[in-house]
């Protein structure tokens, strides 16, 4: 998997990291090519030892609706086939796992992820509404201006009408967003088979009482400070003064909202 440059996504990602006062929103959208090379080919050969690429793997029911899997036993289209019957090929499953590995490396390794940790979403409109509701409830009016820009950029990159949409819903032990204070999170894959491309949209909300941007900034400052001291010892030069920039915040106008 190769991360594809996208200036529109970079601009949007800067607006998806938001401190709301009571929570911290961290989101990103990334585009990946499914063309395998190098390590991907080696990993794919190992992956195929457990089954051929065309073999279908059973997926878990979608969780977009907020209902538990047991309450999603039947689809709207009929009584015989429900979300539990959703499947994908092992090759597609490999693409999803490889995308996670590329996006979260080096902090996490998803090589042992299994098909039951993924779901195929029922429709584009369902996913769009779920994303919109999560982000609008978090940042309110500020998301109204970002929403059309966000979805237009995704559509231009991946052609949403042609996509199969998957989500990653792991157990707490495997969830990279399962830390204390996590309020909600989502991980969506927009897969266009024709383009051989995946757009990965990941976002989480962390309680402000358990996570502060300054903590990450202090850790970075300590690392940089140690490097500066080492350089000074080697060169005998003086250090430069500086400090972390204040994180950008969105306007905090909070009103109740109901997503339709």
Curated annotation (Swiss-Prot):
One of its GO terms (molecular function) is RNA polymerase III core binding. Its main location: nucleus. GO terms for biological process: negative regulation of transcription by RNA polymerase III. Keywords: Cytoplasm, Isopeptide bond, Nucleus, Phosphoprotein, Repressor, Transcription, Transcription regulation, Ubl conjugation. The modification Phosphoserine is found at residues 60, 65, 68, 70, 75, 214. InterPro entries: Maf1, Maf1_sf. The modification Phosphothreonine is found at residues 64, 212. Residues 61-76 have a biased composition (Polar residues). It is found in: Nucleus; Cytoplasm. Residues 58-85, 211-260 are annotated as: Disordered. Phosphorylated at Ser-60, Ser-68 and Ser-75; the major sites of phosphorylation. Nuclear accumulation correlates with a concomitant dephosphorylation. Phosphorylation may attenuate its RNA polymerase III-repressive function. GO terms for cellular component: cytoplasm; nucleus. Residues 218-235 have a biased composition (Acidic residues). It holds the Pfam family Maf1. It comes from the Eukaryota. Coiled coil: none annotated. Belongs to the MAF1 family. PANTHER family: REPRESSOR OF RNA POLYMERASE III TRANSCRIPTION MAF1, REPRESSOR OF RNA POLYMERASE III TRANSCRIPTION MAF1 HOMOLOG. Interacts with TFIIIB subunits BRF1 and BRF2. Interacts with Pol III subunit POLR3F. Interacts with TFIIIC subunit GTF3C1. Plays a role in the repression of RNA polymerase III-mediated transcription in response to changing nutritional, environmental and cellular stress conditions to balance the production of highly abundant tRNAs, 5S rRNA, and other small non-coding RNAs with cell growth and maintenance. Also plays a key role in cell fate determination by promoting mesorderm induction and adipocyte differentiation. Mechanistically, associates with the RNA polymerase III clamp and thereby impairs its recruitment to the complex made of the promoter DNA, TBP and the initiation factor TFIIIB. This is Repressor of RNA polymerase III transcription MAF1 homolog. It comes from Bos taurus. The lineage of its organism: Eukaryota, Metazoa, Chordata, Craniata, Vertebrata.
């Amino acid at each position: 998997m190769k991360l594809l440059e996208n200036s529109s996504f970079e601009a949007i990602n800067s607006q998806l990291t938001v401190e709301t006062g009571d929570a911290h929103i961290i989101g990103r959208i990334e585009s990946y090519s499914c063309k395998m090379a190098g390590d991907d080919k080696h990993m794919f050969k190992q992956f195929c030892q457990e089954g051929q690429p065309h073999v279908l793997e059973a997926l878990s029911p979608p969780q977009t609706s907020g209902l538990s899997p047991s309450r999603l036993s039947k689809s709207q289209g009929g009584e015989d086939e429900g979300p539990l019957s959703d499947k994908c090929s092992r090759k597609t499953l490999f693409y999803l796992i490889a995308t996670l590995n590329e996006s979260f490396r080096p902090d996490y390794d998803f090589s042992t992820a299994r098909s039951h940790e993924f779901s195929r979403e029922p429709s584009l409109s369902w996913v769009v509404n779920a994303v919109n509701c999560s982000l609008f409830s978090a940042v309110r009016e500020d998301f109204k201006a970002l929403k059309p820009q966000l979805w237009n950029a995704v559509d231009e990159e991946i052609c949403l009408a042609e996509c199969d949409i998957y989500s990653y819903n792991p157990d707490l032990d495997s969830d990279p967003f399962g830390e204390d204070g996590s309020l909600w999170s989502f991980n969506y894959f927009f897969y266009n088979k024709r383009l051989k491309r995946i757009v990965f949209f990941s976002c989480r909300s962390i309680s402000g009482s358990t996570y502060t941007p300054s903590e990450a900034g202090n850790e970075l400052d300590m690392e940089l400070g140690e490097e500066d001291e080492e350089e000074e010892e080697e060169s005998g030069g003086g250090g430069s003064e500086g400090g972390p920039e204040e994180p950008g915040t969105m306007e905090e106008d909070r009103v109740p909202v109901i997503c339709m």
